[in-house]
Amino acid sequence: MAERPLDVIHRSLDKDVLVILKKGFEFRGRLIGYDIHLNVVLADAEMVQDGEVVKKYGKIVIRGDNVLAISPTEE
């Protein structure tokens, strides 16, 4: 049986993920919520550029239309 995209995201709950946005911004943080529109809530969120943290946000909501990719980070 094929794996559904939301299954991958669900398994990433309470784990660190990398969220890549359409305009090239990247955020790293702990995924604490999402919905079917791919709106995501990150805790301990950081904006990352070239692998370096450029700003810390704490808890943020990212609108799903801006999301290009969500990737579980290496543990």
Curated annotation (Swiss-Prot):
PROSITE patterns: SM. Residues 4-75 form the Sm domain. GO terms for molecular function: RNA binding. Coiled coil: none annotated. CDD domains: archaeal_Sm1. One of its GO terms (cellular component) is ribonucleoprotein complex. Keywords: Ribonucleoprotein. The keyword Ribonucleoprotein applies. The keyword Ribonucleoprotein applies. Gene3D superfamilies: 2.30.30.100. InterPro entries: Lsm6/sSmF (IPR016487), LSM_dom_sf (IPR010920), Sm (IPR047575), Sm_dom_euk/arc (IPR001163), snRNP_Sm-like_arc (IPR022901). GO terms for biological process: mRNA splicing, via spliceosome. Belongs to the snRNP Sm proteins family. This is Putative snRNP Sm-like protein. It comes from Pyrococcus horikoshii (strain ATCC 700860 / DSM 12428 / JCM 9974 / NBRC 100139 / OT-3).
